[in-house]
Amino acid sequence: MSNYHFETLQLHVGQEQADPASDARAVPIYATTSYVFHNSQHAADRFSLADSGNIYGRLTNSTQDVFEKRIAALEGGTAGLAVASGAAAIVYAIQALARQGEHIVAQKTIYGGTSNLLAHTLPQYGITTTFVDAHNLEEVEAAIQPNTKAVYIETLGNPNSDIPDIDAIAGIAHRHGLPLVIDNTFGTPYLIRPIEHGADIVVHSATKFIGGHGTTLGGVIVDAGTFDWAGSGAYPWISEPNPSYHGVQFTKAAPTAPFVTYVRAILLRDEGACISPFAAFLLLQGTETLSLRLERHAENTKRVVEFLVKHPMVESVSHPSLPDHPDHALYEKYFPNGGASIFTFRIKGGREEAFKFIDSLKIFSLLANVADVKSLVIHPASTTHAQLTDEELANVGIYQNTIRLSIGTEHIDDILADLDQALNAVK
C-alpha cells in the first residue's frame, strides 16, 4: 500500500482485507497467550525464524502485528515492534546497541525519564552517556569515542520543543559508522518522518499522540532497514551467529529488519515487556485518527502561542514557531505543517506564581502525561524534572517559573479563556 497517502495508510495497513477468520472489518482483539502449530516441523520452523508466524504471546500477537505494521508503514520503516511502554521501547533500543563498557552520545534536552535512564540507571550496567548540545555539531562529533555505539536525539525536545538538525546529526553518526536513534513521540510520523532524514531506528511512546486519549500505555520501535549491521562489525550479536538463539544470524534471518527482529527474539523474549492485545487494539483506534487530531492540535497550539506572547503575565514563550526562537529555521525545515503542541512558557514571578496559575486552571488537567486530546499542564521543575538540581534544570532550559502545556483539541475559545482567567488570577 506504499502508494497511498498517510490518511489512508493509518486506516488500512496490516488489515487490507477483512479478518479472514470472522470477516470482521475492525481489527479483532486476539486474547490468547499461545498459538497452535500445524505439526512438529511447523513448530520448528517458527522457532528457527524460517517461518515468521506467531509463537507465544510475549513475542507476537495478531492484533499487535497489525499495529506494528501500521506504525512502521507510517514512519517509512521496514518493520516495527510494539512493547509495553515508551520507556521499554527506549531501554530495548539502547540495550540492543550497547554493552558493558560502551557509550552513547545523547542530546541533553530530552525527556527527563530518558535522561535519568542514561545518566543513572544504565551506568550501573556499564553503559555511559555523554550529553551534548545538539545544536553544536562540533560538540556532537567531539563526544564520539571509540566505544560509542549510537547517537540518540528527539525530533522535538521535552519539554521545550527544541529541534536538532536531524540531517546534520545523521551525517555525523553515519560518518563514524553509528546508527542514529530518534524518539519521534512528539513529532509523530504525520508531522515528520525521521527515517527520511537519516534515522536508522525510531522509537515512540505510543501512549502519547499515537494513542491520543490518555487511556493506554505502549511503545514502538521502528527499524528503518537502512543500517549496514553486517558491514559495521560493531554489533556481532545482530550480524553474527547468536548463541542464545540457535546460532541465528539476524542479518540473514531477517535481512530487511534485523534490528527489531533481534530485539523481539532476544530482549523481549528474556525481559518480557510485552504489549497486551487489548493495549494494541486501543492504540490502533488512536492511530486511525492521528492525522485529524494532529491538525487540530497544531491549529490550537498556534493560537495559544499567539495569545501567550501578548499576555502581560507571561515572561517568555519557548515555541519554535516564533521568529525569535533559536530553532525557528529548523522548525520551518522539519515541521512545515506546524506542530510542537507540547511546549513551555515562563510566567512572571517564580514557583509560587506558577503553582497559582496551574491551580487556577479549569479545563487543563494537572498530570504527568502529554499529547492527549484533553489540554494538560504541569510544573516540570517540581515533577517530571524534579531529580535535577537548579543548575541542571537551567542547563536544559527549565526554571522555577517554567510551565509546560500540552494543547488539546477542545474549542480554541474555551482554551484561551481558561488560560486568560488563570493568568489573571495570579496578578
PLM segments and residue spans:
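Conserved PLP-enzyme active-site core in the AAT-like
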Residues: S2, G14-A18, A79-H311
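N-terminal "arm"/small-domain region of PLP-dependent enzymes with the aminotransferase-like
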Residues: S2-N61, K69-R70
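Conserved N-terminal alpha-helix of the aminotransferase class I/II PLP-enzyme fold
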Residues: N39-A88, G113-T121
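Glycine-centered tight turns that cap/initiate beta-strands
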Residues: G76, N147, M313-S316, I363, ...
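PLP-dependent enzyme catalytic core of the Aspartate aminotransferase-like
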Residues: A119, T128, P146, R293, ...
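Active-site beta-loop-alpha junctions enriched in small/polar residues
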Residues: L156, T185-G187, L322, K348, ...
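Short hydrophobic/aromatic beta-strand micro-patches
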Residues: V222, T344-R346, S406-G408
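Conserved small-domain helix->loop->beta segment predominantly found in fold-type I
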Residues: E271-C274, A279-A280, Q285-T289, L294-R296, ...
